[in-house]
Amino acid sequence: MAKKIRLAYTAAALIPLSVLAAACGSSSPSPSSSGSSSPAAAAMVGSALPTSPSKTAETITETGSSLLYPLMGTWTSAYQKQFINSAGAPLVTIETGSTGSGTGITDASTGTINIGASDAYLSSSDMQTYPSMENIALAISAQQINYNLPTVKTPLKLDGTVLTEIYTGKITKWNDSAIAALNPGVSLPDLTIVPLHRADSSGDTFLFTSYLNAQDSSGWSSSNVGTSISWPNVSGALAETGNGGMVTGCAATKGCIAYIGISYLSKTQAAGLGQAVLKNGAGQYEAPTSATISAEANALTGKTPANETLSMIDANASGGYPIVNYEYAIVSKKQMNGIAAEDIRAFLYWCVHTGQSGTNYLDAVDFQPLPSSVVTLSDNQIAKIGA
């Protein structure tokens, strides 16, 4: 029988879910934020990173981000098939779930699960509350803005100010003059806009509200940026759970607008939803493609600190798509025992090395791989996971 890995502690209080966009520091010891390491340090990290699981039939529990969930499912399936015992059974079982980033953060921080998957990193205050927790970058993803306008065939240009006014109820019709000004020559319907947002605590909400605040700080306050927020009271607005719910809800509601993770691109296309081109920090309008996501990430990944808490929202990157992020594993450095720690280290190491293959894993969910400098930072953090 598989043994379930548990953390070495439980916390009485739930983690605050006001995850902020600014890069934050950890109270835990960490290597230099430059991402470089000495040969001796690299050797120490390498010796702490097993490349295969133990043989004690452990079970690792993971839940959280619905944006990361499709990739995590592919990763865990491949990992369990690669590492098997003489009877053909997996050496380690990995249980995954799509509950939203906020739940993943909370459950990992309070010891309910081993790995919390999140599109958002822990805020500095959360890191002070839970100093043993780490934000480990696993891949680079992005977020779409989708809409249900069957008569509009040209991708609509939108910016943070217009989106803010839609989600605060100031713009209520698709043929509003502010939208028309961004889209000259496009025939916009006299149709009521139905803003759709997440009902669950979500990293996608963190990303979306971060973009609104970055482009229109007077219209969308930084105090209303997070995984779980107080949405303005907008007539007709709807809420759905998970990215899957957002796709289904938007597809069923003519006039809807929604923010949906890039890993659901094939589903939004199959549902016939339009995809906006968004204004970036350089004043350009870009769609989320491999090239534009990479352009945004490349402008910032070199600034990733040792604890990997970095916002890539609305950078001043030419050709960059403005809603890009790291996908994180939120993990405690203090596991129940050495075997548990070894198995978690081995799986996460596999994710940031073998799991970075575009052909085998990332391309199917429209994610981008970590640059080698960030892989080194993730390795450094993974190596800290112990008992």
Give the positions of each predicted feature:
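Flexible loop/hinge segments at secondary-structure junctions
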Residues: A2, G25-A387
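Bacterial N-terminal signal peptides that target proteins for export
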Residues: M1-A12
